[in-house]
Amino acid sequence: MAGAYETKQYRNVFAEYGYSEEEIEKRVQETFETIFHGSEEERFYHEAGEDMGFMEDTGNHDARTEGMSYGMMVCVQLDKKEEFDRLWKWTRTYMYMDEGPGKNYFAWSCALDGTRNADGPAPDGEEYFAMALFFASRRWGDGEGIFNYSREAKAILHECVHKGEPGHPGDPMWEPSNKLIKFVPGLDFSDPSYHLPHFYELFAEYADEEDRKFWKGAAEASRAYLHKACHPDTGLSAEYADYDGTPHSAHQEIFGRHDWYYSCLLYTSDAA
């Protein structure tokens, strides 16, 4: 069955439940304004200086690549270029690592003043950054420097695939032998909530030509993996899972603690 990307027919479940287009749009815009420009008690986007901004993780009082990339995705979907560029510049200024084993990846957590809390990445941030940047390129066109969105996206994905090859130190974010995303580059197991096969289908169209076959294979591998990693009755996934889909016993061999709802949302998004 062809999905929305092929048919150009995008479902609106709110409309299917009887809400008018005006009601839906009003609620979306009100929610954006609350999160990005509401009162100090409500919003978790904050401007920093003249041209940067960050998304605060309110439970941990830091900024994470996960939240920054989600914020960028919201902005590009809603045509909010100023906020998008502010988030991306903050990310590139404070989170981007230019040396060490994580060179060209992004530190997964920073304090709200930009000080790094970590020297390693979390791959879900990189994949969302890349997709948001590709969308920005297609919506607004490429600019200069770090705002050459498509170039930045391709560079991120190149690192994710090719680290660990001769002359390219470090570890890739996708395991080359099975094309599955890792929990972190240096460990050999996955996180079901990271799997975005619908993103990988688009990476197979937008990424560097040499890597497009890889991304097509990653989409197929990811879909097969989710069938193994999600419980057959509940649909819940473990926090972490080995490459065969079984819960990763060395860490958290449990279902439905933190990230199970991500997996549910992601595989339903892929189906759409």
Task: Please place each PLM-identified region on the residue numbering.
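Ligand-binding pocket segment of bilobal, Venus flytrap-like solute-binding proteins
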Residues: 261-266
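Conserved small/polar residues in nucleotide/adenosyl-binding loops
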Residues: 267-272
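Aromatic- and glycine-enriched pocket-lining scaffold segments that form the walls
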Residues: 134-233
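Penicillin-binding protein/beta-lactamase superfamily catalytic region
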Residues: 252-260
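Aromatic-rich carbohydrate-recognition surfaces in CAZymes
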Residues: 61-68, 116-141
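Low-complexity, Ser/Thr/Pro/Gly-enriched N-terminal "stalk/linker" regions
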Residues: 1-66, 77-112, 116, 168-176, ...
